[in-house]
Curated annotation (Swiss-Prot):
Native source species: Macaca fascicularis (Crab-eating macaque)
Keywords (A to Z) from UniProt: Mitochondrion, Phosphoprotein, Ribonucleoprotein, Ribosomal protein, Transit peptide
Family, per entry: Belongs to the bacterial ribosomal protein bL34 family.
UniProt protein name: Large ribosomal subunit protein bL34m
One of the record's GO cellular component terms: mitochondrial large ribosomal subunit
Length: 92
């Protein structure tokens, strides 16, 4: 009976019947096959990444500026070390 129904259906319906209803599955499971040949779910898109660095000139100058460098002995060493190396920019 299935063979008879398959022969009566058109080519598009027959290909859908051969897929075993795969076109009815959720779209997330129709990903590319993984190393074992199994379909993998698509990656969730809810979480954003890579936006941790939001530059602020005030914070940059306060942390790495000339006044902050000269206010501590370690900062003076940083300036002298950069002078010795020949850096054009000694601080921010």
């Amino acid at each position: 009976m299935a063979l008879l129904a398959g022969s009566l259906l058109g080519p598009t319906s027959r290909s859908a019947a051969l897929l075993g209803g795969r076109w009815l599955q959720p779209r997330a499971w129709l990903g590319f096959p993984d190393a074992w040949g199994l379909p993998t779910p698509q990656q969730a898109r809810g979480k954003s990444r890579g936006n941790e660095y939001q530059p602020s000139n005030i914070k940059r100058k306060n942390k790495h500026g000339w006044v902050r460098r000269l206010s501590t002995p370690a900062g003076v060493q940083v300036i002298l070390r950069r002078m010795l190396k020949g850096r054009k920019s000694l601080s921010h």
